Amino acid sequence: MTKKYNIAVIGATGNVGRETLNILAERHFPINKIYAIASDNSLGREVRFGEKILHINSIKIFNFHDIEIAFFCAGSNVSKEFIPKATSCNCIVIDKTSLFRADNQVPLIVPEVNLSTLKEFNTKNIIANPNCIVIPLVVVLKPLDNEIKIKRVVISTYQSVSGAGKAGMDELYNQTKSKYVFRENNPKKFPKQIAFNLFPYIGDLNKDGYTSEETKIAFELNKIMGNHFKTSVTSVRVPVFIGHAISVNIEFSDKIYAKDVEEILQDADGIVTISNNNGLAYISPIEVVGEDAVYVSRIRNDLSKDNTINLWITCDNLRKGAALNSVQIAEALINNYL
């Protein structure tokens, strides 16, 4: 008989929390009891779990004593305050914030890439879910690096407003609506107007001129892949509700052609490749909403530099970029260690 687990989803009313509940139900995760948890501001609200309706529990008074796996989908401040309470009850935490990603005692996991490091979870009973850009990036880069070592990667990201939470989506919606009725709607969540606009600024600005998002992406990429190639990142916020896109320029240590890259990625887990057969052979963010795969298109040789490939990645940032990856971690956890 399959063992069933007691599960808690913290931040259950947010974008990633709701998607986590959806995916747990879709994939028939073996659940005994499931709890939807959020701040007191969400008390009285309900969320769906498959055909069931869950009432919100307050994080302030929730007892993790009987919980075996907890998905933390709220902000870093919530994780900082409540993850120690969860782990003190022998609960295993899968944290989707950036709080523990740089901790050498906490594995940073993308199941298609570095599942072997999952065994290190029991040092702190915490597993970190990577950044929503890093997940699709390493899914694509790892199988290529396995074939021919990568020397350098130049990354430009085009990140939807859902990466900034429900408040980001609301701001894009309200600003767009206001523009059509000639009404002012000043930025609150973002530093500048996001409707009909984009800006190369996500997070805070560091002294070196890079933003905190760009620094996180470079750090996490090297932690997962191994620090053997150089990385340059520019992160752009775009007026798209859901779906991230990434333009990637990859320099390899030896000769490689676009057809080689396409063949390697066709055999890789979690990837759908689109051949350059016609003018519409590319995938845009809106086309990947609700999809689990990482899509790769516009694969081509860089005409300005030898041994270098350009390609275009698109991914649903709420699914594989966040919720799906964490559920896949939990599935690997129960199949191999619990």
Curated annotation (Swiss-Prot):
Catalytic reaction annotation: L-aspartate 4-semialdehyde + phosphate + NADP(+) = 4-phospho-L-aspartate + NADPH + H(+)
Annotated positions binding NADP(+): T13, G14, N15, V16, N41, S42, S162, G163, P187, N317
Pfam families reported in the protein's UniProt record: Semialdhyde_dh, Semialdhyde_dhC
Keywords: Amino-acid biosynthesis, Diaminopimelate biosynthesis, Lysine biosynthesis, Methionine biosynthesis, NADP, Oxidoreductase, Threonine biosynthesis
Catalytic site: C132 (acyl-thioester intermediate), H244 (proton acceptor)
Keyword Amino-acid biosynthesis: yes
InterPro entries per UniProt: Asp_semialdehyde_DH, Asp_semialdehyde_DH_beta, NAD(P)-bd_dom_sf, Semialdehyde_DH_NAD-bd, Semialdhyde_DH_dimer_dom
Involved pathway(s): Amino-acid biosynthesis; L-lysine biosynthesis via DAP pathway; (S)-tetrahydrodipicolinate from L-aspartate: step 2/4; Amino-acid biosynthesis; L-methionine biosynthesis via de novo pathway; L-homoserine from L-aspartate: step 2/3; Amino-acid biosynthesis; L-threonine biosynthesis; L-threonine from L-aspartate: step 2/5
List of residues binding phosphate: R101, K216
Binding site for substrate: Q159, R237
GO BP terms: 'de novo' L-methionine biosynthetic process; diaminopimelate biosynthetic process; isoleucine biosynthetic process; lysine biosynthetic process via diaminopimelate; threonine biosynthetic process
GO-annotated molecular function: aspartate-semialdehyde dehydrogenase activity; NAD binding; NADP binding; protein dimerization activity
EC number, UniProt record: 1.2.1.11
Leading EC class: oxidoreductase
Subunit structure, as described in the record: Homodimer.
Purpose: Catalyzes the NADPH-dependent formation of L-aspartate-semialdehyde (L-ASA) by the reductive dephosphorylation of L-aspartyl-4-phosphate.
Family: Belongs to the aspartate-semialdehyde dehydrogenase family.
PANTHER family: ASPARTATE-SEMIALDEHYDE DEHYDROGENASE, DEHYDROGENASE, PUTATIVE-RELATED
Protein name according to UniProt: Aspartate-semialdehyde dehydrogenase
UniProt source species: Rickettsia prowazekii (strain Madrid E)
